[in-house]
């Protein structure tokens, strides 16, 4: 059953955040992750307007998405945004069965 990595970000240092963003695509692919939406046009319909970048990644399974996030490779890449590049909230959401 597919699962979705939903992320919302606020970027503080674009150069540091870009280092993170450049490293992530091959890591996601290694775990079967497929970007469905990333940094495009958005409109906040309800709630606080604290975030300015939104990402949706599809994984074949919930477990693969969690394994990707927990991987050493992803955690090393995430250091660039965690060290002042930005703040991110990430949620894994299991999809509906077919």
Protein language model annotation of sequence segments:
Residues 1-54, 59-70, 94-98:
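Short S/T/G/P-rich N-terminal loop/turn motif that feeds into the first structured element of a domain
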């Amino acid at each position: 059953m597919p699962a979705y990595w939903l992320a919302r970000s606020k970027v503080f240092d674009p150069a540091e955040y870009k280092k993170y963003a450049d490293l992530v695509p091959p890591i996601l692919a290694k775990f079967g992750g497929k970007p469905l939406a990333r940094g495009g046009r958005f409109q906040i319909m309800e709630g606080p307007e604290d975030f300015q970048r939104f990402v949706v990644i599809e994984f074949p399974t919930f477990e693969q998405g969690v394994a990707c996030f927990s991987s050493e490779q992803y955690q090393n890449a995430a250091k660039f945004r965690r060290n002042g590049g930005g703040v991110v909230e990430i949620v894994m959401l299991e999809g509906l069965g077919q």
